């Protein structure tokens, strides 16, 4: 029964590759995919991990990491039809839970946000797609059918059938699960963005005030410079005016 179930799960993992990768032309090529190697080794390690067998699950995990560049903790729970495309750099933490028919691209991290024990990694529900280099952190939930854009940093729950992009990730679209059509959602409150915009406006205001002060200071200095430059001429003229009577008296013999 265990072997039969394992073969069914393996079949679904292979089906997921054919479903999601147009480059998968035949079974021989698919069997060379590092993502498939990683999930096969993980399922073996996880089965041993659940039986509380020490050391061996972790050893298998490290061998898988060495061979594929994909690091999956033996404790992570992963459903059927799981596909890691390309795979290099994928990290999945111990308490992560992944549903059925989930697809990850290279560089995805399902990580924690601290050193606390217990549930600390994401829960990814069925039919989720997580793009290249996305980082999903903490004990949050990515709802069924959600899409996470490449490079996004997700630290909050993503509702089902929504698309989240950006740093930090924001909901930008919602897909109808029946028709498959997406529609953009109204802008959500963005306190971080509003704070940054407020700081930007404040910096501009301060720059304008500094420019005004510099301009006023320049005018003030220019006025003083002109005043002091003119002062020697004024003093010389005053001295000449004051000495004129004395010179006249001297010429008339008053000083002899």
Role assignments for model-derived ranges:
Residues 34-35, 40-43, 76, 82, ...:
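Solvent-exposed, flexible loop/coil residues
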Residues 170, 174-181:
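A structural signal for small-residue-enriched, beta-sheet-centric alpha/beta enzyme cores
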Residues 1-63, 179-256:
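Terminal amphipathic alpha-helical/low-complexity segments used for targeting or macromolecular assembly
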Residues 65-172:
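Structural signal for interior beta-strand "rungs" in well-ordered beta-sheet cores
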């Amino acid at each position: 029964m265990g072997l039969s179930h394992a073969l069914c799960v393996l079949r679904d993992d292979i089906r997921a590759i054919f479903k999601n990768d147009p480059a998968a032309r035949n079974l021989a090529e698919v069997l060379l995919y590092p993502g498939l190697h990683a999930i096969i080794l993980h399922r073996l390690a996880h089965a041993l991990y659940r039986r509380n067998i020490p050391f061996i699950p972790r050893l298998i995990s490290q061998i898988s990491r060495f061979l594929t560049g994909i690091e999956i903790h033996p404790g992570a729970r992963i459903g059927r039809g799981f596909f890691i495309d390309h795979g290099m750099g994928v990290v999945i933490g111990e308490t992560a839970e992944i549903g059925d028919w989930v697809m990850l691209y290279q560089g995805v991290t399902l990580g924690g946000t601290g050193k606390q024990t217990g549930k600390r990694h994401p829960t990814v529900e069925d039919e989720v797609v997580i793009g290249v280099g996305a980082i999903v952190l903490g004990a949050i939930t990515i709802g069924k059918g959600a899409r996470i854009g490449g490079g996004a940093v997700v630290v909050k729950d993503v509702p089902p059938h929504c698309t989240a992009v950006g740093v930090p990730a924001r909901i930008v679209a919602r897909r109808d699960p029946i028709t498959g059509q997406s529609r953009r959602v109204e802008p959500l409150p963005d306190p971080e963005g509003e704070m940054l915009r407020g700081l930007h406006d404040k910096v501009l205001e301060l720059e304008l005030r500094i420019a005004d002060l510099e301009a006023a200071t320049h005018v003030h200095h220019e006025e003083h410079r002109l005043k002091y430059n003119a002062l020697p001429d004024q003093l010389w003229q005053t001295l000449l005016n004051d000495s004129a009577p004395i010179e006249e008296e001297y010429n008339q013999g008053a000083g002899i």
